[in-house]
Amino acid sequence: MVSHCQRGSVQSSRPDVKKRVAFIGQPNTGKSTFFNRITKANAAIANWPGLTVDLFRAVVPLQGELIEFVDLPGIYDLNGFSEDERVVQRFLANYAVNLVVVVVNAAQIDRQIRLLLQVQTLGIPAITLLNLADEAKRYGVQIDVAALQERLGLPLYPISAKYGTGCSRAMDAIGRAVKDQPEAYQIPNLVNVLSDHPVAIADMETALAGVVQMPSPNARTLTNVIDGVMLHPVFGLPIFFASMFGVFWVIWHVGLPSADPVDAVTGWVQSNILEPLFSPLPTILQGLLLDGIWTGFAALLSFVPLVAIFFIVMGILEGSGYLSRAAYLMDALMGRLGLDGRSFVLQMMGFGCNVPAIMGTRVMRSRGMRLLSMLVIPFSLCSARLQVFVFILAAVMPGTQGAIALFLLYLMSFVAAFTVAAILSRFHYFQARDPFVLELPPYRLPTFKQVFLRVWGEMREFVARLSMFMVIGSSLIWFLTSFPQGSTGLETFAGRIGSVFQPLMNPLGINPFLTISLIFGFVAKEVQIAALTVIYGLNNSEAVSDQIHSTVTFAQGFSYCLFSLIYIPCLTTLGAIWGESKSLAYTAISVATPLVTAWLFSFIFYQSFSWLGW
């Protein structure tokens, strides 16, 4: 059973954890959904020495033991060559596990059995979860679980990670398997083993013969009917962009008003609690705590509801299976730009945060395509930029016009990305093609719990990550806008720094105060709002909005948003680009290219509006 494995020991960051379970599966199998369900969305990103990726891990008490669960990247082949496949290979080679849990989409078992047979070939202790078993029955897939289990010699458990059916039984089985398996194993020669014992198509057919019956490939399903409209060569793209306009309409009309109650609460806390509490302190320390740290933190809190609504809407779209269709629709266009549908998927991922989208380029085998994708992904209208744009546009545009302007910025993010890709793909450094396989899952209705767990995980990471940046950034902003003592406005350190760049920003209609906020936006885009609050010397975002409304025109505000959309990525994204590219020169290119592009786009927009007299 373990002839190809080598005994090892589990070395965890927690000394009380002695056993480890690794989850393996193809993309879109529901592996991460099951992982989130059993860990109650309490998984944390952990760094693993020797791997080029951070993996989700969680420590779960199970049958009297603390067990470390690790969610490995979704892969199609354990013997493949993509970066994600190499990550899984290195993990199993270097980190001992007591058990491997293979998650298989029961509706696609004829295609996913290969990965299961590869795990079986390795001889490592494993059990299999047949996810979406209920969905498989609806599609006419018939599986004799007992017969298939006997043939494979591996325990099989039908589950529905989405609804929780069978999950308790599966967890009990995992607990028993780990308890009965005191030894941990790793496979240092994994690639050689799979190369010497390849899984052929005949092996897959033999494993399923007589125990699995698949429906006719020509069977007409509801998904096929819907795809006839959604993927229509004429109507497909208009439907997609109409859907995205709906997303930004909801964000504008539901998310924007949600900031007002939070502003009221943070204002009350400052006036009635913090100011009396800090009054005995020296004036300079009061300024740091109230005008610096608290102002930045309050600005972050005011946009938490808006970002949560954004993640809810995107979670529904993603859970329904629609976003992968968008990649299919855009594949032909992306191909002309030297990219493919995967790059578009990563652009969509960048709506949440650019960092995981940058890391997602590992699925591309071609280095040229990876580098080009990493260069254009930061143009995505991420949740951090979204806060800034909603804030500025609400101040300079009334009603639904602001939602339209927000949607135009979304479109401009693609225009900028496509323009840069079209130009740079002509250079040999970025030229390469890579086979592209896209799995189109059936349309599904996301459950409340599924969306909630997704949003909870995203928001927890969002607040945790940005709290640090807000405290540091707001403190730095307060210092630079408060010193030298007695100076105000452009006489401060921040004003002097902004004055250096102002000659470049004047043709864009961006005033000195906005210029200073852009400088601080390099740390994190959300800091721009805190920067404006501190720079204007006001204590809440509503007062800043009124100030911008009276001093900034629509053309100036939109030009500022357009520049902020495209210019230099935030510090965390740059760190991800450096880590993925392993090249300081390329990282410098990823700074210079968006800066030049942002200036040109904003210049053309603002000068055109000025020429028209708007």
From Swiss-Prot:
GO molecular function: ferrous iron transmembrane transporter activity; GTP binding
Membrane disposition: Multi-pass membrane protein
Binding site for GTP 2: G50, L51, T52, V53, D54
A Pfam family recorded for this sequence: Gate
Residues where GTP binds: N131, L132, A133, D134, S160, A161, K162
Main location: membrane
Positions of GTP 3 binding: D71, L72, P73, G74
Subcellular location: Cell inner membrane
Binding site for GTP 1: G25, Q26, P27, N28, T29, G30, K31, S32
Key words, A-Z: Cell inner membrane, Cell membrane, GTP-binding, Ion transport, Iron, Iron transport, Membrane, Nucleotide-binding, Transmembrane, Transmembrane helix, Transport
GO cellular component: plasma membrane
Organism superkingdom: Bacteria
Xref: CDD domains: FeoB
Transmembrane segments: 234-254, 297-317, 374-394, 404-424, 466-486, 504-524, 558-578, 585-605
Signal peptide: none
Location of the FeoB-type G domain: 18-180
Similarity field: Belongs to the TRAFAC class TrmE-Era-EngA-EngB-Septin-like GTPase superfamily. FeoB GTPase (TC 9.A.8) family.
Function noted in UniProt: Probable transporter of a GTP-driven Fe(2+) uptake system.
Name of the protein: Fe(2+) transporter FeoB
Biological source species: Synechocystis sp. (strain ATCC 27184 / PCC 6803 / Kazusa)
Lineage of the organism: Bacteria, Bacillati, Cyanobacteriota, Cyanophyceae, Synechococcales
